[in-house]
């Protein structure tokens, strides 16, 4: 299947997905994307999943694990807690306490290692929150030789999680109307086909992390991820929440919805100061407060 997405670009690891000194632990990984999703799922617990797994997550791990940007550091924590091979499922108490981005990054790293082009996509899922709400989320997009790019949600690779979310689709082939890449969400609210505050971390009656500014932020993260810059979800740069210019995000949406125009997306990311990830970002850590972080 021909593609304008240049899947070969997504075979190599990024600074964020590189296992570094832990590469030998990848030797026993299978080549099957579905099995790789389950392996990633079995070494990570989402920090909101304590009740589902009947596990009390220690406060220090709840607050600090998901601040780990780079996969080599994530793998270090996983193996310090249990030195078994990565293919060995961990007990909840021995897992890395992360978020959707961490699961997707681990899955993406595995896929790239075994020769499957893969990338992160930032956007919004309609199966993680109340009806009508699209929750901030990250999925893996991987290349299938027959069908092209498919969306996978490794968070759903554990049947307990899939059942709790009441999903009725294959987690390795997420329908694109159930997970909207950020540019599509941006287009949806710009066309008044959905309320802006129906996209975010939570609905407006639960807090302020929703709305047009938040979708713009996710659109910026998705462009960065397509350029293999897979930052934390709360790493920020560019426009603030009080001033969201439409034109840059309209352009990002044009390039990233449907077949990605990769050369144009790479050019835009390199040339647009407000869209390009700077060397130093402002990280709005949910538990630890804001701080400036210089990236590797």
PLM features per residue range, with description:
Residues 2-15, 37-47, 54-60, 79, ...:
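His-Asp-centered catalytic microenvironments across diverse enzyme cores
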Residues 14-23:
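Generic N-terminal amphipathic, Lys/Arg-enriched alpha-helix
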Residues 24-29, 93-94:
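Asp/Glu-centered strand-loop micro-motifs enriched in Gly/Pro and often flanked by an aromatic residue
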Residues 24-25, 33, 107-110, 139-144:
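Functionally constrained cores in energy, signaling, and assembly domains
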Residues 27-87:
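N-terminal, Lys/Arg-enriched amphipathic/low-complexity engagement segments
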Residues 31, 144-146, 296:
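Generic structural signal for short, solvent-exposed loop/turn connectors between secondary structure elements
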Residues 63-138:
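Active-site neighborhood of thiol-dependent amide/isopeptide-bond enzymes
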Residues 283-296:
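A eukaryote-biased signal for long
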């Amino acid at each position: 299947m021909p593609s304008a997405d240049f899947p070969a670009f997504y075979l190599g690891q990024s600074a964020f997905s590189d296992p570094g000194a832990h590469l030998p632990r990848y030797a026993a990984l299978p080549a099957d994307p579905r099995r790789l999703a389950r392996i990633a799922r079995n070494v990570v617990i989402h920090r909101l999943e304590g009740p589902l797994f009947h596990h009390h997550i220690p406060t220090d791990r709840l607050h600090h694990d998901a601040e780990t940007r780079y996969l080599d550091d994530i793998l270090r924590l996983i193996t310090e807690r249990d030195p078994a091979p990565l293919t060995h499922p961990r007990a909840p108490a021995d897992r890395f306490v992360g978020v959707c981005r961490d699961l997707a990054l681990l899955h993406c790293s595995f896929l790239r290692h075994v020769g499957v082009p893969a990338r992160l996509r930032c956007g919004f899922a309609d199966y993680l929150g109340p009806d009508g709400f699209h929750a901030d989320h990250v999925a893996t997009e991987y290349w299938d030789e027959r069908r092209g790019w498919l969306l996978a949600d490794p968070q759903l690779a554990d049947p307990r999680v899939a059942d709790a979310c009441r999903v009725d689709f294959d987690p390795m082939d997420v329908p694109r109307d159930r997970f909207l890449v950020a540019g599509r969400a941006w287009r949806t609210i710009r066309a008044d086909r959905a309320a802006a505050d129906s996209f975010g971390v939570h609905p407006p009656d639960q807090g302020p992390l929703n709305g047009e500014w938040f979708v713009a932020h996710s659109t910026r993260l998705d462009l960065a991820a397509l350029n293999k810059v897979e930052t934390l979800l709360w790493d920020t740069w560019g426009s603030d929440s009080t001033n969201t210019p439409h034109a840059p995000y309209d352009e990002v949406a044009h390039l990233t919805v449907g077949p990605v125009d990769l050369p144009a997306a790479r050019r835009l990311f390199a040339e647009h100061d407000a869209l390009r990830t700077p060397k130093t970002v402002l990280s709005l850590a949910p538990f630890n407060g804001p701080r400036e972080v210089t990236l590797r």
